[in-house]
Amino acid sequence: DMEITDETVIYESKILDSHPLKYYIIHKPSGYVCANKDPHDPCLITLLPDDNLHYVGRLDRDTTGLVILTNDLKLRKRLTLPEFHIPRTYAFTCLNPLKDITSFKEGITIDGDVKCLPAIVEMTSEYEGVITLEEGRYHEIKKMFLSLNNKITSLHRIMYGDISLGDLE
């Protein structure tokens, strides 16, 4: 008689395999990449004691902030798939004053024909603000700003769902 759970495999009342679920929240510094191997840049995963982990939402090399790593593939799927509507929140600085935030609410078209899901932007100054979105396409925020003839100069993820950086530095 065999029993298999997310954490263990039990056969004839003996534990054959045990994989405790692990969760890490890390404050990604600039210059690191969210990859397991990279020939040019240091990988964020090398800062952790366990390399059998998966990224929950990658960040670009120059983007800083909250990254989650786990071996819990069910959680990873739930946090990353768009149908679960998990918000990601970023603080940003842009090159030019951002005057048109209504375009974000309507969904901005990037790469010529890809319409992004609506995003919420709150400005804290002419050049700085916070953006919240529910998907994580490749360079999505940077491309949204480029489509408005602007450029992101600093991007920092502060929340992923209900998880925040807190006091992590």
Report each predicted region and the residues it spans.
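Basic, flexible Lys/Arg- and Gly-enriched helix-loop patches that mediate nucleic-acid binding at interfaces
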Residues: 1-169
